């Protein structure tokens, strides 16, 4: 197939263009990804941020949502008519957010599998003898007896039920051997 007629020029690099500003402006103009899934699914891209949040029953500006009372000016009963509230068209968003906020928070901090195995090995082989644990060949990081004791205490604090089950299993093993 023949080529389309016309001038074909190679692309020239625009030296006078500020790439940093160009990228910054492109990032600023690009719509951000909304992290909250409830808000993201109810979002209407044809409307402004203020309109979207008003439809969901959320406030864009917290200062305007809950205005502070003026101390000096006392309004008369005639002036204190209820302001017409914006119509909340998507109340399920607020309900979902409230339900999610009422859930208990997950424990984010856990111990590494290596540390758990290390503590279990040391207690299984040496019991409460921290000096023997410090001399053990599996003590790769050359922890002192106090450091080992602290690691064991951390394990006890993080996993109390597992620790109790582990100690019970050790005692049952000792009884079988005796």
Swiss-Prot record:
Protein name as catalogued: Nucleolar protein 16
Main location: nucleus
Superkingdom: Eukaryota
PANTHER family in alphabetical order: HSPC111 PROTEIN-RELATED, NUCLEOLAR PROTEIN 16
Native organism: Mus musculus (Mouse)
Pfam families per UniProt: Nop16
Keywords, alphabetical: Acetylation, Isopeptide bond, Nucleus, Phosphoprotein, Ubl conjugation
Cell compartment(s), UniProt: Nucleus, Nucleolus
Keyword match Hydrolase: no
GO cellular component, as recorded: nucleolus; nucleoplasm
Modified residues (N6-acetyllysine): 90
Cross-link (Glycyl lysine isopeptide (Lys-Gly) (interchain with G-Cter in SUMO2)): 74
Recorded family membership: Belongs to the NOP16 family.
Lineage: Eukaryota, Metazoa, Chordata, Craniata, Vertebrata
Stretches the record annotates as Disordered: 1-30
């Amino acid at each position: 197939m023949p080529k389309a007629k016309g001038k074909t020029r190679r692309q020239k690099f625009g030296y006078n263009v500020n790439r940093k500003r160009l990228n910054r402006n492109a990032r600023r103009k690009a719509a951000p990804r909304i992290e909250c899934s409830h808000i993201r699914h109810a979002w209407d891209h044809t409307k402004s941020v203020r309109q979207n949040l008003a439809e969901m029953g959320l406030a864009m500006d917290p200062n305007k949502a809950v205005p502070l009372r003026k101390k000096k000016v006392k309004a008369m009963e005639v002036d204190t008519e209820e302001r017409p509230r914006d119509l909340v068209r998507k109340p399920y968003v607020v309900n979902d957010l409230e339900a999610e906020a009422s859930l208990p928070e997950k424990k984010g901090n856990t111990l590494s599998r290596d540390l758990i195995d290390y503590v279990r090995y040391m207690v299984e082989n040496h019991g409460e003898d921290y000096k023997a644990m410090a001399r053990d060949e599996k003590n790769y990081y050359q922890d002192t007896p106090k450091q080992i004791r602290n690691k064991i205490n951390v394990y006890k604090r993080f996993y109390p039920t597992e620790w109790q089950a582990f100690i019970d299993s050790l005692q049952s093993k000792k009884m079988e051997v005796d």
